[in-house]
A protein has these predicted regions:
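Gly/Ser-rich helix-loop-strand patches that form or flank binding pockets
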Residues: 69, 74-87
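Short glycine-rich anion-binding loops that position phosphate/pyrophosphate groups of nucleotides
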Residues: 11, 64-66, 89, 177-179
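Short glycine/serine/threonine-rich phosphate/pyrophosphate-binding segments
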Residues: 15-16, 65-70, 180-185
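Catalytic core of DAGKc-family lipid kinases
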Residues: 89-169
Length: 291
C-alpha cells in the first residue's frame, strides 16, 4: 500500500469533487489516504489526519502556493510531492485535475522520476547575534520594506567578503526553482531548476550599477540593513515570515534537505516556460508542457 498524504487549498471551488474522485480511486490503486487537518471539513470528520513520517508521497491539490506549503509541512523529511493544478498558473505542479487519475496510476506503477530541488536555510539573527527565526525556502527569501515608500540601504556579504552596499526597495535571495517567481519579476535571471545556485537580485535598485548575481551553492549570504524605514519584513516563499529591524542580520545558505518533486517525463522546462509564462512571445503548436 502507498500512503498518500493530501494537502489542498479550500479556496478552489472544485476541490470537493476532486477529493471525492480521489477517495473512489484510492482502493483500486492500493492507496491509503490521510489529509491535512484543514481538509477534514470537505473530506469528512472521520478522515485520517496526516502524521509526520507516515506518508510515502504528498499529493497537493491547488496551485504553486499549495505545493510550497506542502514543502514546508514536509519539514525536511524529503517526502516526494506530486502536484495537481487546480489554479491558474501551476508552474511547479505536475498536471491539471483532469489528469489526476492517470498521474496516480503511473505513480502507483513506479512510472515516474523525482527531481530533488535545492532549498535555502534562512535565519534572522537579532542585534546580539542570537537566532530568533528560522525557515526552509523552496522558492525564495525576500527582505523588503513594509508600507512606507522609502528605500532600504543594506550591506551584502558572501562567505565573509563584502559584495556591495545596496540601496533598493528590497532584495530577493532565490533558488533555481524560485528563479521564475519574484526573482523573475525583479529582473533576475531564469536558472534551470535542477541546478544548485543562490541568486541575489535587488528589488528596484536605486542605481544602474547593481545587477543580479548568481552565487555558488556553498555561499553563505549575509544581509545587514544600515538605514531605511522602521517597518522591514522578511518573507519566505511568499507565505511566512517576520518583522525585521535595523541592526539584525539575515543569513541565507543552502539547506541540507532538498524537496523531491514528482515528474513523469513528458514535455520540458522550456515548453512550460513558453506555455505558462509566454517565454519567447509565441507558444509552439502541439507542445506538451513539463509534467
Amino acid at each position: 500500500m502507498i500512503r498518500l498524504g493530501v494537502v489542498g487549498h479550500l479556496g478552489y471551488g472544485g476541490l470537493p469533487g476532486v477529493l471525492a474522485a480521489l477517495r473512489r480511486l484510492a482502493p483500486t490503486l492500493e492507496l491509503t489516504l490521510s489529509f491535512e487537518d484543514s481538509l477534514r471539513e470537505v473530506a469528512g470528520p472521520d478522515a485520517p489526519v496526516i502524521e509526520p513520517g507516515k506518508v510515502d508521497v504528498l499529493l497537493t491539490l491547488g496551485g504553486d502556493g499549495t505545493l510550497l506549503r506542502a514543502a514546508r509541512l514536509d519539514a525536511g523529511q524529503e517526502v516526494p510531492i506530486l502536484g495537481i493544478n487546480l489554479g491558474r498558473l501551476g508552474f511547479l505542479t505536475c498536471c491539471p485535475a483532469d489528469m489526476m487519475e492517470e498521474a496516480l496510476r503511473r505513480f502507483a506503477a513506479g512510472d515516474y522520476t523525482v527531481e530533488k530541488r535545492m532549498t535555502l536555510d534562512a535565519r534572522v539573527l537579532d542585534a546580539g547575534g542570537r537566532d530568533r527565526a528560522h525557515w526552509r525556502a523552496l522558492n525564495d527569501v525576500v527582505l523588503h520594506k513594509g508600507g512606507f515608500a522609502r528605500v532600504v540601504t543594506m550591506r551584502v556579504q558572501a562567505n565573509g567578503e563584502s559584495v556591495a552596499r545596496y540601496s533598493a526597495d528590497g532584495i530577493v535571495l532565490a533558488t533555481p526553482t524560485g528563479s521564475t517567481a519574484y526573482n523573475l519579476s525583479a529582473g533576475g535571471p531564469v536558472v534551470f531548476p535542477t541546478l544548485e545556485t543562490i541568486i541575489v537580485t535587488p528589488v528596484s535598485a536605486h542605481t544602474l550599477a547593481l545587477r543580479p548575481l548568481v552565487l555558488a551553492p556553498s555561499a553563505e549570504v549575509l544581509v545587514q540593513p544600515e538605514d531605511g524605514p522602521e517597518e522591514l519584513l522578511v518573507t519566505v516563499d511568499g507565505q511566512v515570515g517576520t518583522t525585521f529591524a535595523i541592526g539584525e542580520t539575515l543569513v541565507v545558505r543552502r539547506s541540507q534537505t532538498p524537496v523531491p518533486i514528482v515528474r513523469f517525463g513528458e514535455g520540458s522546462f522550456f515548453a512550460t516556460m513558453r506555455e505558462k509564462l509566454h517565454w519567447g512571445g509565441l507558444p509552439e503548436r502541439d507542445e506538451t508542457p513539463r509534467c
